[in-house]
Structure formats: C-alpha cells, structure tokens
Regions:
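Primarily recognizes the serine-hydrolase "nucleophile elbow" in alpha/beta-hydrolase
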Residues: 2-3, 44-135, 150-162, 173
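Short amphipathic alpha-helix adjacent to the substrate-entry channel of hydrolases
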Residues: 5-24
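Alpha-helical scaffolding within the catalytic cores
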Residues: 6-12, 159-169
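Short alpha-helix in the alpha/beta-hydrolase fold that links the catalytic acid
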Residues: 8, 176, 190-204, 228-229
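Short beta-to-alpha linker loops that shape the active-site pocket of alpha/beta-hydrolase fold enzymes
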Residues: 21, 26-31, 88, 219
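Short beta-strand/loop motif that positions the catalytic acidic residue
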Residues: 174, 180-182
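Acidic catalytic loop of the alpha/beta-hydrolase fold
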Residues: 185-189, 220-222
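C-terminal catalytic histidine-bearing segment of alpha/beta-hydrolase fold enzymes
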Residues: 196, 204-276
C-alpha cells in the first residue's frame, strides 16, 4: 500500500529475523487504493529477486494484499511459499481511498483490483455504489466497538449475485506450501468462510501444493504473528488492540493466543522452507 508503511517495514523486519530477504511492493507512496494494479509488478519483483541471488521466492500479504498474494501465487509458479492472511477467495472490484464527497473509500465502476497484460481481472462487483458504499460502512461501524466494519459490503454483494468461476482465485495452481489464515470474528469481511471455501475447492480439484487452512474463532482482522506486532508496538499491544477491535476487547487472551500460534506456525514454515 505504501513503500514507507510502518507495518510493512515491521513485516520486513520479522521476515529478516526469520532468515529471509524481503521486498515490499506498492502502487505508490501513500497510495492505499487498489485499481487495476498490474500483476506484472510482482512478476518484475520475482525476476529482480532471482537476479540478485535469491534462489527461492515466497509471498506474504494481509488484508487486500492477502488476496493479491494468492492471485500472484496462482499465476507465478516460481512462488513456492505463500502466506495469505485474511485473504478472500475471489477478486474484488477496484476501489480508491482518500476523500471524495466526505467518503474515505469508494468503488471504481468497471475496474478490478488487479490486472494482467493490460486487462482487468474478472471481479466481484460491489452491490453498493458511491456514496452509499461508504455510508454502509459507517452504518455498520457505528456503535460496533470496531474501528471499522465492512462485512455488509461483501455479504450483500455475494447475495446480489453468484460468483462467476472467472473471478474466483485458482488456488489449485499455487505451488509449494500455502497457508490460509483468518478469524471468524474479522470485522472487515468473512475471512473464515472464504478459507473454508478455498479448502473445499482444493479438496475438489487436483493440486500439488501442500496447504494449511487456519481459521481461528478469535483473532480480529489482525491475524499477524505476535512478534511482528510487538515490533510495531513493543509496549501496550493488547491495550491498543482493545481500542481497535471489539473482539480484542472481549477476548484479549484468545486473540493473543491466536497471534502466538500463527507466529509459531509461520516461523516454523519459513525455517523448513529455507532448509529444503
């Protein structure tokens, strides 16, 4: 989302701590929009990493970037370790963030979040247009105890029309090892449901990847390794989380246990991948 994003830097430091190099990709400085972002950027990044002596390629993404990671891994067989955190199993309509008519986010008609060879990828259109899109987020967020809630955008859009096969992510094409991570109390979208659908898709289709679906009852949208978040907030992590997510306030110990379990699993996966 931003080459100087604080959490992205903490993610890079966490990967360094686990013995791997890290390269962050973003559409531009302070650009948190997702409009036809070219997959070629990831293709170029892979080529650059290989030309600079990296013999293995992995990808890690959270939130919208989690979706990006799964799509990229399904396109590029050089990627042999994929961490998709709170990732959807479908491509979304493109959206922009900023300030437009008092709205902080709005969908872009006719645009996808991702593109390939100059063409937008097939995507799920949001049922709400600007400005109703942001108004729905505000309505759901009000009084929820979460800093933001947007599940209605996805639930209502899925109810409005069935997904086409073209907009679903072909996770069966992913190589190596795949980790799908999310929580059922994610206030942004139904991360747990999407992971279960990907699990079912992989069971029904031939695939070569070794995949690990991890759905936690409690974890919020921040299903990140505990030690990564502690790099960002060395003091008062649980306290801050309570102000961001209601689930972190109601289930602080369970959410912390989730993050610690993710930390153990992903750190172990990186160690094993390095040694292969």
């Amino acid at each position: 989302d931003d080459p100087n994003d604080y959490m992205a830097k903490c993610g890079a430091k966490w990967l360094h701590k686990n013995g791997v190099n890290a390269l962050c990709i973003s559409p531009g400085k302070k650009n948190y929009s997702h409009v036809n972002n070219p997959l070629e950027r990831i293709e170029t990044a892979i080529a650059w990493l290989k030309s600079h002596g990296n013999r293995k390629i992995g990808i890690m993404g959270m939130s919208t970037a989690g979706m990006d990671s799964l799509v990229a891994a399904s396109y590029f067989p050089d990627i042999t370790l994929t961490f998709g955190l709170t990732a959807s199993d479908f491509v979304w309509q493109g959206f922009e963030q900023g300030n437009k008519d008092g709205c902080k986010e709005w969908p872009i008609p006719g645009a996808s979040t991702l593109s390939w060879r100059g063409e937008p990828l097939a995507y799920m259109p949001f049922v709400y247009e600007h400005p109703v899109y942001w108004q729905k987020i505000e309505e759901e967020t009000k009084g929820s105890g979460d800093i933001e809630r947007s599940t209605c955008l996805f639930i209502d859009s899925e109810k409005a029309r069935e997904h086409t096969e073209e907009e679903m992510i072909m996770v069966e094409n992913i190589k190596g090892k795949l980790f799908l991570i999310g929580a059922d109390d994610d206030p942004f979208w139904e991360a747990g449901k999407y992971i279960r659908r990907m699990d079912q898709r992989l069971k029904e289709r031939p695939h070569t990847c070794e995949y690990v679906p991890l759905v936690y009852e409690h974890g919020t949208h921040f299903v990140l390794p505990e030690s990564m978040l502690r790099m960002a907030l060395p003091v008062g992590l649980k306290f801050v989380m309570k102000f961001i997510f209601k689930a972190a306030k109601d289930y602080p110990n369970e959410c912390e246990a989730t993050r610690k379990d993710i930390d153990r699993r992903l750190s172990a996966a990186l160690k094993e991948w390095i040694q292969e």
